[in-house]
Each structure stands twice: as structure tokens, then as C-alpha cells.
Amino acid sequence: MPLTIVVADDDLQYREIVRFLLAAASDTMIIVGEAADGDEALALARRVRPDVVITDLVMPHLNGIELTRRIREELPQTRVVLMSSYTEDAYRLMASDSGADVFVSKQVITSTLVPAIRDLIRRRFSGGSGPPTIGGSSASAQA
């Protein structure tokens, strides 16, 4: 059964990049919905209950941090990948504090998104609870 994914970003170009990366990666990941803002993403996630939500940090109506918090509260089995053009440590910490499983920098998204999702799912199904993957390496290595 393929991994179901919701993609949320107000920038259509990044939604298209994510769509391309996941399609090229394999047929084991399928996008079941896309949203252009946080409110739309939350409603979609509630409806389809995806395995993973990939969300931008900065979006209208509900930002990625608040979206992540709400997903954690309402859909605890759903994993969250937070992506952003901001790379400063403060944003990585906000992502981690909000409950995001993975933080991916948009500057390196083409090389880090799919491996980060695979690592996340591997840890989830192996029962591992290691630190969240952030841009392809563990959070403890980033600290």
C-alpha cells in the first residue's frame, strides 16, 4: 500500500517540485491532496488522514508551525515534514518544538526531501524514536 501524502504550500512552484520529486522517487508515495494555505491543509488532512503532511512554514491563514501543532493534536499518527526557505537554527527549533518530525530546507529540497521521508517512515515502522531528521541529519547533530 502506498504512503499517502498531503502537500501544503502557498507557492504553486514548490507544490509542483514536491509532486515531481515524489513521483520520480517511486510508486510507494502518492499525493492524495494539495493545499495552498494552512486552513485548507488542515481540513484536507482531517478528511483523508494521510500518513504524511509536507507543509511550508509560512502560509496564509494558518502557518506551518500552527498546522503542525493541530495535526499533532488531532491526527497523532500523521507524520509532518516542515519545509522552509528559512534556514536559521531558530526556525529549525520552532519546527521541532511544534512537533514536526522533519525540517527540510527548500534550498536543498531536491536532494533531501525523499531521503528524509524514507528515514522518517523507516523509523516509524521499526518502532524507533530517534531524533527528528532535519535537512538529512539528526537534530542532535545539528545542535
Residue positions per predicted region:
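Two-component/phosphorelay signaling modules centered on CheY-like receiver
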Residues: L12-G33
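Active-site beta3 strand of CheY-like receiver
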Residues: V48-I54
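The C-terminal output helix
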Residues: R118-S138
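Receiver (REC) domain active-site loop signature in two-component systems and cognate sites
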Residues: M59
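Conserved sequence signature across two-component system core domains
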Residues: A8-D9, A35, V53
